[in-house]
C-alpha cells in the first residue's frame, strides 16, 4: 500500500518481510505494567540516555528526535485510561508526536491475542513518519479512535477494530466523533483489514 512508498526498510518496528528490524526493542504492555514499563532512550546529540518509565513517557522521550531505534509496543489484554502513566493529548489520548513534520518514528503498537484493546482513550499521531498500528481494538475513545493530525507520512493502520466513543459536543457525536481522522498534510497512509 501507499504507506510503504519510499520505505524499503519497512514500517514501524518491522521489515517488509514481517520480521523485526535489526536492534528493535520490544516492550510488552498490559494493564498492571503500563505505568511501569521501562527502556532507555537516547535523548541528546552526545548519545546520552534517559530511562523512560511508562508507555507515554517512553514515547515522549522519542519525540526529542535523537533515538530512531525501532520500537514495538505489544498490548496484552485491555489497557484502560486509568492504567496509563499519562496521556499526551487531553482531547485524544496516547500521543505519538515527532520532533517536527514527518519525523522518523519507527514505532509499532500492536495487539497480542484476540482481546488486545485500549479503552477510554484513542491515539493522536502528529508529525511522524513510519508509524504502524495493528491488531487491537479502540473502545470508548475520547474523540477519535485514531487521529492522524498534521504532517504524518507512511502510516499503516491494519487489522483494527473501532468501537463507539464518548459523547461529543456536536449533535452527530452521540457515540463519539470518528474512527480514523486524517488531517493537515497527512499522506501515504494505508488502512486495511
Residue ranges of model-derived segments:
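Flexible, glycine-rich phosphate/dinucleotide-binding loops
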Residues: 35, 81-82
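Generic short beta-strand segments
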Residues: 75-81
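Extracellular beta-strand-rich solenoid/capping regions of secreted or surface-exposed proteins
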Residues: 42-72, 84-108, 116-134, 139-152, ...
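Beta-rich extracellular carbohydrate-active architectures
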Residues: 80, 114, 118, 133, ...
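Acidic Gly/Asp/Thr-rich repetitive segments characteristic of extracellular carbohydrate-active
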Residues: 1-72
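Active-site cradle of extracellular carbohydrate-active enzymes
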Residues: 148, 159-193
Amino acid at each position: 500500500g501507499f504507506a510503504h512508498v519510499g520505505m524499503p526498510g519497512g514500517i514501524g518496528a518491522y521489515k517488509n518481510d514481517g520480521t523485526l528490524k535489526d536492534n528493535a526493542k520490544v516492550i510488552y504492555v498490559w494493564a498492571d505494567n503500563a505505568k511501569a514499563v521501562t527502556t532507555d532512550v537516547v535523548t541528546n546529540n552526545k548519545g546520552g540516555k534517559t530511562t523512560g518509565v511508562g508507555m507515554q513517557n517512553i514515547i515522549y522521550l522519542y519525540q526529542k528526535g535523537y533515538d530512531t531505534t525501532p520500537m514495538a509496543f505489544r498490548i496484552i489484554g485491555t489497557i484502560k485510561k486509568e492504567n496509563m502513566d499519562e496521556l499526551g493529548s487531553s482531547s485524544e489520548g496516547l500521543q505519538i508526536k515527532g520532533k517536527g513534520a514527518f519525523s522518523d518514528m519507527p514505532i509499532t503498537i500492536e495487539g497480542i491475542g484476540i482481546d488486545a484493546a485500549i479503552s477510554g482513550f484513542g491515539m493522536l499521531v502528529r508529525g511522524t513518519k513510519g508509524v504502524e498500528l495493528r491488531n487491537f481494538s479502540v473502545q470508548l475513545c475520547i474523540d477519535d479512535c485514531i487521529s492522524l493530525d498534521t504532517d504524518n507520512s507512511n502510516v499503516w493502520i491494519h487489522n483494527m477494530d473501532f468501537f463507539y466513543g464518548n459523547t461529543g459536543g456536536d449533535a452527530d457525536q452521540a457515540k463519539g466523533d470518528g474512527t480514523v481522522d486524517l488531517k493537515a498534510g497527512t499522506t501515504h497512509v494505508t488502512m486495511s483489514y
